[in-house]
Amino acid sequence: RSGKSRYLADTPKSRSVHYARSAWSLKKADIFEFYRRLAEENPAPETELAYGNAYQLLVAVTCSAQSTDVGVNKATKALFAEVKTPAQMVALGLEGLKAHIKTIGLFNNKAKNVIALSEILVRDHAGEVPADRDALEALPGVGRKTANVVMNTAFGAETFAVDTHIFRVGNRTGIAPGKTVLAVEKALDKKTPQPFRVGAHHWLILHGRYICKARTPECWRCPVADLCRFKPKTAPPKIKSATVQTDPVKPAA
């Protein structure tokens, strides 16, 4: 397969994401317009995880790996009504936490990490969530993506947490192509202009979750379809015509 066809192979019949040479990347003006349109539709994008403070956000994001935000929110609703600080989580204990989050995948490991990171926050950070990447990544169960989410959402940092949705959007649209999650993150950091840098993570993840879907992107209602490199665009679903039933004609008496 030629280099050109390989980069254009992400079609409705072939959903594997391929990675771009420089010609696939959107131009600077198109990137600005891409974000401008997303911002116009959603001026104040927010995470869909429910939380009340930076600590609860950290717990929610830690619990969200391989789980949906909806599932995490259901599990943490009662938990966050009871637990608002690391000290309260430590007091709740491992088994108490497990009882709250047992509906979430991998809840045993997640519970262990949450208790462990809570103990460290109490011991080393006066019960506060640090706004520093290195300090966050030193916590059990906290990787680069989780640290980026917390820094961006809780502290307004210009960080770009790349999950499966943003990885797909970055490569499919050409806004930030890259072969790895880190490559996409670096491309976003390099190419995302002001005033969109703080909101970029939320705009892109919501775009990937609800419009630029993995199996069938909804190009027919996409606000940036004309800027996107994805070809051919998916057509709107066909509307089945309703069958009108009539009463059978009765024979004349």
Where are the model-predicted features located?
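Polybasic, lysine-enriched low-complexity intrinsically disordered terminal tails
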Residues: 1-23, 233-253
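Catalytic cores of DNA base-excision repair glycosylases
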Residues: 24-242, 248
